[in-house]
């Protein structure tokens, strides 16, 4: 008798996705981040669900409801800090996952890659709205500054901002709708993840060599299930170390002050995982220009397949482009640092140089390096 997992309509899908899936025999730990992102999403949905049971999305009680969760709810502090730091782990895994995709040329899987870019935007939107919910100073002013950027859109900008706010400033209506969207978006993300995997399983996984691995496949289970479990254990160790020993290390002290529209914090900045984009936004001394640069800094990922000039897929055997890739990685760290600094000399100049470098490396230098490497390796035909 054939195993039920191969016959049952529902179990068959699970079997073909996680058990009998043919996987390349040589995928490294860089391929662990997909499953880690899945675990992060599950953690965020579960902790978020329990937080929503005690949270109130009203400007007069939102801040105190979060305090109540931390002080009075059984293990409320644990749930709250797992959710807050879980978001940080989510973004660390996201950035590494995208970086892996860029390094090994996974963007040649066009559908999978484009769904991934949409997922990145969706997760960023969710995280932004979640940061507004505790209704601290940085929640309020972050929401005010970022939503205000939409007013740079010609003609419809101001109307659009007031429509999103539900009034003439960030207030009760804004908080309520942000809570509603913050609750629903993770489920939309989960649906998109299924589509992401659906497209991935049409082609099969990429691998570090960038070569076709059809001739050398192994079953996903037990090889990669056990490997993924190791990754999950390490992820949970890092997350719980953050939660139990340094719960506030990635947060902003200003968010422990209740929101006050009459008192602006000295330095308004988003959570650490948005700082690189915030630095690019601030580096352009024009509102609309800054907003466009901000959007393009992420949207540029969608045009990576068009910038592929090399005859090879990944960067494994391409030392020139490899060097540029790691300079780009360092450049992103510089942008992250600058995003958290005040707008004054020399930070303004450093931010502008890092922003120019970011776009130059991706749009000009890497494609040129690809062509040079083709010639050096005599891949001219």
Curated annotation (Swiss-Prot):
Gene giving rise to this polypeptide: MT-CYB
GO-annotated biological processes: mitochondrial electron transport, ubiquinol to cytochrome c
UniProt similarity note: Belongs to the cytochrome b family.
Cofactor(s) required for function per UniProt: heme b
InterPro entries documented for this protein: Cyt_b/b6_C, Cyt_b/b6_C_sf, Cyt_b/b6_N, Cytb/b6-like_sf, Cytochrome_b, Cytochrome_b_C_euk/bac, Cytochrome_b_N_euk/bac, Di-haem_cyt_TM
Additional note from the record: Heme 1 (or BL or b562) is low-potential and absorbs at about 562 nm, and heme 2 (or BH or b566) is high-potential and absorbs at about 566 nm.
Cofactor note: Binds 2 heme b groups non-covalently.
Residues where heme b b566 binds: 97, 196
Pfam families for this protein: Cytochrom_B_C (PF00032), Cytochrome_B (PF00033)
Species in which this protein is naturally found: Reithrodontomys mexicanus
An annotated GO cellular component: respiratory chain complex III
Transmembrane segments: 33-53, 77-98, 113-133, 178-198, 226-246, 288-308, 320-340, 347-367
Annotated positions binding a ubiquinone: 201
Record's protein name: Cytochrome b
């Amino acid at each position: 008798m054939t195993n039920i997992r191969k016959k049952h309509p529902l179990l068959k899908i699970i079997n073909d996705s996680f058990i009998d899936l043919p996987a390349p025999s040589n995928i490294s730990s860089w391929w662990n981040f997909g499953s880690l992102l899945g675990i992060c999403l599950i953690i965020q949905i579960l902790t978020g669900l329990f937080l929503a049971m005690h949270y109130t999305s009203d400007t007069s009680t939102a801040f105190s409801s979060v305090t109540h969760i931390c002080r009075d709810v059984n293990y409320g502090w644990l749930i709250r800090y797992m959710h807050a730091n879980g978001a940080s782990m989510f973004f660390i895994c996201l950035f590494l996952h995208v970086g892996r995709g860029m390094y090994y040329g996974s963007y040649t899987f066009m559908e999978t890659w484009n769904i991934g870019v949409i997922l990145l935007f969706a997760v960023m939107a969710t995280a932004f709205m979640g940061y507004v919910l505790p209704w601290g100073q940085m929640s309020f002013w972050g929401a005010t500054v970022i939503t205000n950027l939409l007013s740079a859109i010609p003609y419809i900008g101001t109307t659009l901002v007031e429509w999103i706010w539900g009034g003439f400033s960030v207030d009760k209506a804004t908080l309520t709708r942000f809570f509603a969207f913050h609750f629903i978006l993770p489920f939309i993300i989960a649906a998109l993840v299924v589509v992401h995997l659906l497209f991935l399983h049409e082609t099969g996984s990429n691998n570090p060599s960038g070569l076709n691995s059809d001739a050398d496949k192994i079953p996903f289970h037990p090889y990669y299930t056990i490997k993924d479990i190791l990754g999950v254990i390490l992820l949970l160790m890092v997350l719980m170390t953050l939660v139990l020993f340094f719960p506030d290390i990635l947060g902003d002290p200003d968010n422990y002050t209740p929101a006050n529209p009459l008192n602006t914090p000295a330095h308004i900045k988003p959570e650490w995982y948005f700082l690189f984009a915030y630095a690019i936004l601030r580096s352009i001394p024009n509102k609309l220009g800054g907003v466009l640069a901000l959007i393009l800094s992420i949207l540029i990922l969608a045009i990576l397949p068009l910038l592929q000039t090399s005859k090879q897929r990944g960067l494994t055997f391409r030392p020139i482009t490899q060097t540029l890739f790691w300079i780009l990685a360092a450049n992103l760290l510089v942008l992250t640092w600058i995003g958290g600094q005040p707008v004054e000399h020399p930070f303004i100049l450093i931010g502008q140089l890092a922003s120019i470098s970011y776009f130059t490396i991706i749009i000009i230098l890497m494609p040129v390096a690809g062509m040079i490497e083709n010639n050096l390796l005599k891949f001219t035909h």
